[in-house]
């Protein structure tokens, strides 16, 4: 980044007054995450950008932007697959998604959450969305999923705020056996702070 992003180089030189040699991840200098909102920090040539990841903008109107090239995208997918394999095993498990399919089917709703759901779906099979388009629990769909898949390991994925604000409530009020479920939750914690 230091060699390929002039703004990043300016920040590092301004904070540390010298070029830092980072031989391991622990040596990479920390920078305020807010810089990704206020500055275009990209070490990828514009023509090589495959996608741009954006934050949710929960703490303000301005979103952080991270520019991804093809190699980085492939590395991310391999890294995630390797990490999940240690948790979920080698076979794709039936997947209960604690979200609505509207989070990615409708371009109007497509955001970081929708992209996150789509990205995680490749690691599961026999997908079941636990929430309807109004983000209310679909108890019948959940019960049907558990009837078919609940006796063996299955994968549960959702964003933290939906796990606690929507799914946790339905668990308290219904006799659902999720003992074979493997829950992975991600992001959405800022929305919980608001509550």
Model-derived features: where do they sit?
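Active-site diphosphate/adenylate-binding microenvironment
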Residues: 3, 7-10, 14-54, 62-66, ...
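A short, flexible beta-alpha/helix-coil linker loop
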Residues: 61-62, 102, 188-192
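"Short basic amphipathic alpha-helical interaction patches in structured regions
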Residues: 65-74, 110-114, 171
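Conserved ATP-dependent adenylate/AMP-binding module captured primarily in the ANL superfamily
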Residues: 77-93, 140-148
């Amino acid at each position: 980044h230091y060699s390929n992003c002039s703004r990043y180089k300016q920040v590092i030189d301004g904070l540390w007054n010298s070029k830092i040699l980072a031989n391991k991840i622990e040596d990479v200098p920390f920078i305020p995450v807010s810089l990704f909102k206020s500055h275009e920090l990209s070490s990828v040539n514009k023509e090589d950008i495959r996608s741009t990841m954006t934050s949710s903008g929960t703490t303000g109107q301005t979103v952080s932007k991270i520019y991804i090239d093809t190699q980085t995208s492939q590395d991310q997918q391999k890294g995630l697959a390797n990490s999940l394999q240690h948790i979920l095993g080698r076979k794709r498990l039936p997947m209960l998604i604690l979200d609505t399919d509207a989070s990615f089917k409708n371009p109007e709703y497509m955001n970081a959450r929708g992209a996150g759901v789509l990205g995680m779906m490749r690691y599961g099979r026999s997908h079941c969305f636990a929430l309807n388009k109004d983000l209310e629990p679909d108890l019948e769909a959940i019960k049907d999923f558990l009837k078919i898949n609940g006796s063996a390991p299955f994968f549960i994925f959702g964003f933290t705020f939906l796990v606690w604000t929507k799914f946790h409530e339905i668990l308290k009020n219904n006799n659902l056996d999720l003992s074979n479920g493997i829950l992975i939750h991600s992001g959405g914690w800022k929305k919980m702070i608001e509550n």
